[in-house]
Amino acid sequence: MKKVWFSLLGGAMLLGSVASGASAESSVSGPAQLTPTFHTEQWKAPSSVSGDDIVWSYLNRQKKSLLGVDSSSVREQFRIVDRTSDKSGVSHYRLKQYVNGIPVYGAEQTIHVGKSGEVTSYLGAVINEDQQEEATQGTTPKISASEAVYTAYKEAAARIEALPTSDDTISKDAEEPSSVSKDTYAEAANNDKTLSVDKDELSLDKASVLKDSKIEAVEAEKSSIAKIANLQPEVDPKAELYYYPKGDDLLLVYVTEVNVLEPAPLRTRYIIDANDGSIVFQYDIINEATGKGVLGDSKSFTTTASGSSYQLKDTTRGNGIVTYTASNRQSIPGTLLTDADNVWNDPAGVDAHAYAAKTYDYYKSKFGRNSIDGRGLQLRSTVHYGSRYNNAFWNGSQMTYGDGDGDGSTFIAFSGDPDVVGHELTHGVTEYTSNLEYYGESGALNEAFSDVIGNDIQRKNWLVGDDIYTPNICGDALRSMSNPTLYDQPHHYSNLYKGSSDNGGVHTNSGIINKAYYLLAQGGTFHGVTVNGIGRDAAVQIYYSAFTNYLTSSSDFSNARAAVIQAAKDLYGANSAEATAAAKSFDAVG
C-alpha cells in the first residue's frame, strides 16, 4: 500500500522527515566530506608489545602508506577515544585525528586486535599531511562560540515559525524517482533561510565561555537563548571547534546543535564557519520511532513504592528506568507516573516502561551491554507527548512517544510496539558507539541498525511497527525487512534513492541493508545470488559487532559490507559458513 510519512517539523523520527532547513550546501553524501576505507590485516606486533601499544606500533608502521603522515609522530595526531572487547576476544579501538590540536570532522578510525595480539582490520578516514597544509585559517576563530550558538538558534527560530504545532498533521505529495515509488512527505521547512548574525544583536551576555586547549565551549543560560523566538534549549548549548574538510579546503568551524521541544521538537546539527559565521552545513538529527498495555495485553513490570503510592520507576536495571507523562503538552520529561494500588491503567505508560526494561534486558543478555551507553545510563521515557502526535523520537537523552492520531484509525500510542521502543533506544546505542551521521548512506545505516535490533527484540515476524500502525488492518506495517518494496523502500543498491528528501533517504535506503540482514538470517535466492541463512542469533551478533565496533560516523554501505564480513570472520572464523553468508548477503543486494 502507499505509505504516508508523517512529520511535524524538520526532524527525522521513526516515520520520516521534512526536508532539512537552510543549508549552504545540500548533498546526499552528508556533512562528513571524508569516506572511510577498509583494510584487512594480519599484522602481528612484537611479543614485547601489548595493549594500546599494539595500536601505536601498527600505526607507526603504516603511517605513511595508510595515514599519509610522514614527518610527525602518530601520537601527536591521533588519540584513542574508546576501547572495548567482544566475546571472541577481539579488542576494538576507536580513534580520532587532530591537526594543530583541533579535531578533524569525520576523521575517525577503528582498529581491531585479535586475542593473540594481531591487528585484523582497520577502517578509517584521515587527512594526510598534504591536505593539512590547507588549514590556512589557523587555530584562532574570528567569531566566538556564543556567536555560533546564536546563529544556529536564530536560523532554527526562523524555520520553526513557519511550521505547524503538533496538533496539525501536514503532508504534501512529492514525486520520487521511479526506483522508490511515490511517497507522501511532510514538507514545511524553507530551504533558503540562512541567517547571518549581527554581533550587536547578540544577547548571550550572561554566557560563560570555557576553554579547554583548542576546544571552546559555551554554556549559555537557557533564559538568554529563550529570547530567540521563545526557544527553550533542552540541553545547555555548546559549540566545539573543528577543522572541516570541504573540497580542497580545511575550514575552521564550530559544530553546535539546537535541541528544543517547543513549539515543536527539533534537533539540528550546524557546522558554522568560525571566521565569517556562515552556515556551512546543517541537518536534522532527532531520531525517530500488572497492567494492560496499548493492545490490551496484561504484563508485569517493576515499580517503586513511595509513601502511599507507587512510581513507574525501576531501580533494578542499571541506573534505573523511569517513565513520565507529558499530559499531552510539549514539555519533557513531564510528570513521573504514579498509581495508588500498583494496578496501572495507563496503557501507553505501561508499555513504554515494560518495553524499555525488555530492551535493557535484551542488550544485557545478548551482548553484555549495560544500557544504552554501556555504563548503566538511566532509561527515561515520556508518553502522551503533544496532541495527536504521530511519532516517537530519541532526542539524545530520552525517549518520547506520541499517542497517535486520537481515533486509532492510522496510529495508536507509539509505545505499544516493542520493536518501535527497541528501534528508538538503539538510536541511543548508535550515538554512543559509531555515531553514524544521520544523513545519506550513513543515516540509512543508522536506521537499519535500529530496525535490526528492534525487530530482533520482538522476533514476531519481519515487520516494523505492525502493532501500532493501522490496527484494524491485519498484517499492515511501517516497513518490511523481508520485502522492503511493500512499503516503498528499495531492496537493491541499483534502486538507491539519491534525492535530498528524508535527509537523503535515511528511512528509504535502509531497506537495502534490512534486506541483506534478512537474507543473512533466513537465507534465500535474490538477484541470482543464493544465501544460506545462519539464523537470527548469529546474524544479530554479527550486526551488533559490526555497527558498534567497526563503523565510524561517516561510514557508507561499502564500509558496512566490509564491517559485517570482518565481524563474521572475527566471531566465527575466516572460512566459516557465517562469513561466507555475510559476503553473499551483500552480493545479493548489490
From Swiss-Prot:
It is found in: Secreted. PROSITE patterns: ZINC_PROTEASE. It is an enzyme of class 3 (hydrolase). Binds 4 Ca(2+) ions per subunit. Ca(2+) 3 binds at D466. SUPFAM superfamilies: Metalloproteases ('zincins'), catalytic domain. The keyword Zinc applies. It catalyses: Similar, but not identical, to that of thermolysin. It holds the Pfam family FTP. Residues 1-24 form the signal peptide. The keyword Secreted applies. Its EC number is 3.4.24.28. Keywords: Calcium, Hydrolase, Metal-binding, Metalloprotease, Protease, Secreted, Signal, Zinc, Zymogen. GO terms for cellular component: extracellular region. Residues 25-286 form a propeptide. GO terms for biological process: proteolysis. This is Bacillolysin. The gene is npr.
